[in-house]
Each structure stands twice: as C-alpha cells, then as structure tokens.
Regions:
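Bacterial N-terminal signal peptides that target proteins for export
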Residues: 1-10
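Cys-dependent protein tyrosine phosphatase-like superfamily
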Residues: 14-125, 138-226
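Short cysteine clusters
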Residues: 129
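Conserved lysine of the Walker
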Residues: 135
Length: 226
C-alpha cells in the first residue's frame, strides 16, 4: 500500500514537472531585457528600438494605419525593390539603400547609419528589409554599437536572440560585427566620410570629383604684365 502511494505521488510529481515545462518555457521566452527592441506588431515583425527608431519586415498597404499612428516620417528599405509599390503617403519620405549582408562593407553601414540619423532628426523612422532579420538586423546591431555605444556582445545577443527570425540568417551579419572597427566607423560617421578606408571605391570617387572641381590657373594670366 505504501509502495503504491509512493509510486502515485512520484507519478504526480513527474506529471506536474512536465506540465509546468511549457509554461516555464513560455515565461522565459516572454522575458525580454527592457533595453532590447520591444515588439509592436508581430505580423510585420515590427519592433521599437528607441523613441524614434523602428525595425520591421517588408510592410504592405495594410501597415499604413499603424505607421501613421506611430508618426513614421521616413521609411528606409535595404531591398533592391522600391517601397513605392505600397507607400505613397504624402509627408512620408522613402529612402532606398540596397545591400547584401554577404557582401557588406563599411561604406554600406555608414550610409545606412547616416541615413537613419538624418531621418531621426525629422521624426520617427522605420527601417526594413524582406524579413526584418538579416539586413535590418545588421544595421540595427551596428546602430547599437556605433551610435548608442553598446558592446558588440550585447548587440549580437539582441540580434540573434531577440526573436527577429531564424538564427541561420545572422551568420554574415555576426561575422561583420565581430570584425568591424568601431572606433574607425564612429570617426568616419562623425566626419561625414563615406568609408573607413581612403582606398574604398566611394573615397576614390570623392577624391576624383574634388580634384575635378579645383579651378585651373591660366598660365598666361600668371605672367607679370609689361
């Protein structure tokens, strides 16, 4: 009799432990550091990173009422396709900065960060790609590190564990973040440089354009008059 009671209690205890596991897992999933981007709308993978910056997957016309409610003034896409297909709202600026995480360099990140900062000066900003995970996730992580001063570790934790998408999407972005020279990026961003390297294509183009605009002296005009 005692053995039977003991076995029954043991079974009940095991059942209770198993029954609590999903609830505990759900609670752990819902526990989110307050400094991480906070969910706004799951259907669009829409999160708020700061009072003036949001991130999402590719929106559509159905998202417009929500974007208007959030007072979004600029939408930045990292896709090669224009947002004009779904966004033509007067007063909302469209910015297109296509890039790929497997071919990203410092000039791509600086261009994106600069666009975000310039747009934030005018009001709330939404940045997005197709799924809102890899391209958007990389820019978000670099914004955290370069602009907001987060550590790489903290930014990568948010990128990979924040619930923005499948982890296999992040490998190229993680590689870039780990190798990025944050001090050089921060200096280039502050100075208005297009890249951290003077040998980057955009830097060479800028140098060629600057030399082309230098006024040339007329050798005859330089001669002393008699």
């Amino acid at each position: 009799m005692l053995k039977l009671c003991f076995r029954s209690l043991l079974c009940l205890a095991l059942f209770a432990a198993v029954a609590q596991t999903p609830a505990q897992a759900a609670e752990a999933t819902e526990t989110r550091p307050p400094e991480w981007a906070q969910p706004v709308e799951k259907d669009y993978n829409l999160y708020q990173m700061s009072p003036t910056l949001y991130r999402s997957s590719l929106p559509d016309g159905g998202a417009l009422p929500l974007l208007m409610k959030l007072k979004i003034g600029t939408v930045i896409t990292f896709l090669p396709e224009s947002d004009a297909r779904w966004l033509s709202t007067p007063g909302v600026e469209r910015v297109q900065l296509p890039y790929r995480t497997n071919h990203v360099d410092d000039s791509d990140i600086l261009r994106a960060l600069r666009a975000v900062q310039e747009a934030e000066a005018k009001g709330p900003v939404l940045m997005h790609c197709k799924h809102g995970s890899d391209r958007t996730g990389l820019v978000a992580a670099m914004y955290r590190v370069v602009v907001q001063g987060w550590s790489k570790e903290d930014a990568l934790n948010e990128m990979t564990e924040g619930g923005f998408g499948d982890s296999h999407h992040f490998k190229d972005g993680v590689r870039y973040v780990m190798q990025a020279d944050v001090d050089k990026l921060r200096t280039a961003l502050a100075n208005g440089d297009c890249s951290t390297s003077v040998f980057a294509l955009c830097s060479l183009k800028s140098w060629v354009n600057s030399t082309a605009t230098i006024p040339r002296l007329d050798p005859q005009a330089a001669l002393p008059q008699r």
